[in-house]
């Protein structure tokens, strides 16, 4: 039986400009939920990991496509060593690696992990600042962090998924991330 917290109202509409249906979680979008790194986030691991200050960075970033990868490749050349705790490792060994194949078996790309979290995550105590090195560097450059970061990193806590049926019709669903969405670690 569903718990009250799992019951949501949804809004759906057809996009007249393309063969697409939008499903939007109205309950979540109207909620007062906040997801701000460093403000008590319990993280996405199996148990409360607030003290680790990893937030949703425990598994690295999973890129949505090559454009997403290229955004970070272009941004990285502007990140200074004093802004990124693992800059030397990223320069020497790279910051990307192959991920698990997607649902259709196609290859994916993810950020490398260092010490069980994203290579771009500056850990507590780093002189350049705790949190995402891409975010820190973008702010220092006077630019928007969303222009430097992987899509998933600036979209969280909102999840956008697209499914295409056999006729080519796309259903796009806009909703909250749930712990189960993070896979084995977030259940």
Predicted segments, located by residue:
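Short loop/turn segments that flank or connect secondary-structure elements
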Residues: 1-187
């Amino acid at each position: 039986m569903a718990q009250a917290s799992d019951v949501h109202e949804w809004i759906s509409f057809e996009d007249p400009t393309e063969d697409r249906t939008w499903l939007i979680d109205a309950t979540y979008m109207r909620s007062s939920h906040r997801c701000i790194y460093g403000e008590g986030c319990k993280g996405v691991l199996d148990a409360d990991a607030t003290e680790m200050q990893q937030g949703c960075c425990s598994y690295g970033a999973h890129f949505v496509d090559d454009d997403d990868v290229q955004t970070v490749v272009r941004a990285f050349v502007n990140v200074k060593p004093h802004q990124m705790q693992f800059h030397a490792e990223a320069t020497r060994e790279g910051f990307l690696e192959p991920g698990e194949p997607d649902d259709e078996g196609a290859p994916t790309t993810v950020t490398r992990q260092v010490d069980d979290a994203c290579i771009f995550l500056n850990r507590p105590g780093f002189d350049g600042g705790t949190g995402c090195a891409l975010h820190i560097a973008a702010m220092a450059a006077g630019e928007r962090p969303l222009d430097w970061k992987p899509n998933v990193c600036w979209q969280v806590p909102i999840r956008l998924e697209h499914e295409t049926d056999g006729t080519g019709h796309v259903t796009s669903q806009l909703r909250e991330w749930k712990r189960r969405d993070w896979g084995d670690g977030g259940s």
